[in-house]
Amino acid sequence: MSQAVSYAILVLTIIAFLLTAAALCTPAWQVVYAREIRQWVQSGLWLSCQTRPNGMYSCTYTFSHDDFNTYFSDEVSGFRTPSFYPWQRTLFHIYLISQAFAMLSLISFCVSVSHKESKMPNILRSVFLVLAAVIAFGCLIAFAVYSYMVEYRFFHVSVSGIYEKHRGYSWYIALTGAFVYLVAIILSVVHVLLQARNSNTTMSRQNINSSLQSDFFEYQYHPNRSMESFEDRFAMRTLPPVPRQEKKTTVF
């Protein structure tokens, strides 16, 4: 039972890690269709893509504030590049920390396989999963708050061409990954409790067996010992308690 739960946690952690990685690698965190220029515009944490009227799909990316910090890019001619904001880059870096904690939880599982009697690897795995889930949920909430602000909610093409952005499939993929992390945390806590209970049961059985063995060897007759020492031990043995005499009451 405990081993099955442990492998279920492993599978859920891998699924959550891959879902979060897929969300980070795709640009559809905010999506808008600009009818004036007939383009779908997708804005991610580090990647922004748009479709041209001729069907061409072009993307721009940023890893620093100096890459694309203006609304138009002089380096790319002929099409508009969505602006990147510092909070997007910050959330991306924080998300990478969450993924690092998920990797540490997987490493803790590998350690727990080789040290089955130790509780520490499983406890560390639970702690790393909690940290990964908390950071993931925090980033999702922060993105929802920022994307709802007026400054980052609309895509401006012209004075009259203002279009509202909506959360895209990348955000929902990341949300699914965060909930899978949450399920893995619940199973991880259950696994730690099961391991603690099994450990206590094993220790109690060992104590009982050692006590019985010590009592057996204490009163066992050894032919190498003298008869007098055996008789002395037999005479000094603990006697059972005297049974109580029940008073009989006669009813007339």
Curated annotation (Swiss-Prot):
The keyword Membrane applies. Belongs to the Clc family. This is Clc-like protein 2. It comes from the Eukaryota. It is found in: Membrane. The keyword Transmembrane applies. It is a multi-pass membrane protein. One of its GO terms (biological process) is epithelial cell-cell adhesion. Disulfide bonds: none annotated. GO terms for cellular component: membrane; plasma membrane. Gene3D superfamilies: 1.20.140.150. Its main location: membrane. Keywords: Membrane, Transmembrane, Transmembrane helix. InterPro entries: Claudin_CS (IPR017974), Clc_prot-like (IPR010761), PMP-22/EMP/MP20-like (IPR050579). The chain crosses the membrane at residues 7-29, 91-111, 127-147, 173-193. It comes from Caenorhabditis elegans.
